[in-house]
Amino acid sequence: MIGSAAGRTRVRRGAMLLAALLSAAVPAAAAVDDEPGGLVSPSATLGRVRALYERAHSREHSRGATVLEDWRLFQDGTVGSFRVNRLGKDFRETTTLGPLAYERGLLHGTHWEQNRNGIVFSYPGIHEQRDAVSDRAFRDPSDERDVRLIGDSPAFNAYVVEVNPPAGRHEWLFVDKRSGNVVRREFVERRRRYTTTYDDYRLVDGVFEPSRVRTVDSLGNEREQILVNRSLDATPDPRDVDMPPSRHVVEFPERQTAVRLPVRFINGLAVVRVIVGRGAYDFLLDSGAAGIVIDPSVVEQQNLERYGQRLGATLGTFPESSTIVPQMSIGGLRMRGVVARVVRVPFRPDERTHVSGLLGFEFFADAVVHLDFEKNLAEALPPEHFRAPADASSVGIALDDKTPAVAARAGSANGRVVLDTGANRTVFQTAFADRGDFAPQRVASTTHVRGMGGFTSAEPTRLAQFEIGGIWTRGATADVANADLGTEDVDGIIGTDFLRTYDMWFDYRTATVYLRRAKR
């Protein structure tokens, strides 16, 4: 509900899905959806609260001036900076924490991001659409089904409104009784509860903006930004909100149009040999990983420096930090100055293979990755030289979470699934299985799936049919689980038990994956 780019900054981490990984939320679902505490009976009507809010938000930022903001940032135990350039509805945000930086923005309706390795990509903004749905519901005076005034907060001198429309964000807005500004927002994302407070509002370009914003999630991760300077540039330059140029992180040998990767296929997973410093390690070729991930043992052996510290969560909580790897070699390919997440990787595809890392988003984003499981082939191609096979189907991918989400049909339902080469089992959400009428067709007892921090349960089922890109698979077995699959707005994770039926080319540059049925 806050117009400011700073106020609406999403505290969101990319999904990381590993071999045979299901992600389940740590907090209990009931606690996540509980009403805020400390409320008393409401002293106004919902209509009055909406009118108060609208009076405070009657204007939007114009394109007559660029709003320039500099903030002091505290995040992940690190002090940094946060800069915002805003021109009308367009904005560009830059977060800097020590030697690491990333940017996000909106340009003419297109969401974009430059990640910590300098790769720029656009994405549909499916999670932002949830926020927009809730915003419209709150501001729609006729919607009293999805919006409720649930009480007053004496601690914040605010009215508290619950907003929970279908396809929207479940949130609680604390509307200040005097100003009509939102002073606190609690919301649910990935089955985790977030609380954001907004303080010290000031009028900027006719719009009230906070000067201090603090967000804490239910794991205790915290981000706080305090305004240092805010100014208006009356001679706006559209370049202030432009996308930055993208950096290339994968270096190919000269005059080579394809590089075969040093890979072994173990239990359906592509295990690639990666040289880091003077050590050789096994990494998963993992489209389901939202970045490059390395095990802490590699950091220790190579004497790499760590930056920041936070808690992650899948099946349990675990510490994670970041590092910069001077060089990684994958066959004839080189990656230099790579920012990686440091997370313990507990998977062993077989008795003699210990996975020490994941080749995720950056590798897939800067090379066309070709996988043919039937031929035990994995290769990387320079994007500028790639030509899609004439007999392949093209399927659009969405990179909101730095993982390839596609439209698919399972049973009788259409859904959104992630193509995950780092998982050897396919998992669908229980709600999606019910919608597709394939949940009751159980063929075996409950199974256990291991992930970061522990295990979860899943139930095998048989699908009458499954389709991606016009290619149908019939009578396949998949798992069904009532679990968080690592990101919001996803109905399933398609693992290599399904993907092995395809010859695949991942082309993130054009947001496309090319598929054809594998020849046997």
What positions do the PLM features span?
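Boundary at the C-terminal end of the N-terminal hydrophobic targeting segment
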Residues: 28-31
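N-terminal mature ectodomain segment of secretory-pathway/periplasmic proteins
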Residues: 37-119
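Flexible, processing/modification-adjacent segments and terminal tails
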Residues: 33, 37-48, 107-172, 176-181, ...
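Short structural boundary motif marking the start of a folded domain
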Residues: 65-67, 159, 259
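Pepsin/retropepsin-fold aspartyl endopeptidases
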Residues: 81-83, 89-92, 153-154, 164-166, ...
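A cross-family detector of function-defining hotspots
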Residues: 74-76, 150-152, 316
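Bacterial N-terminal signal peptides
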Residues: 15-25
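Bacterial N-terminal signal peptides that target proteins for export
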Residues: 2-17
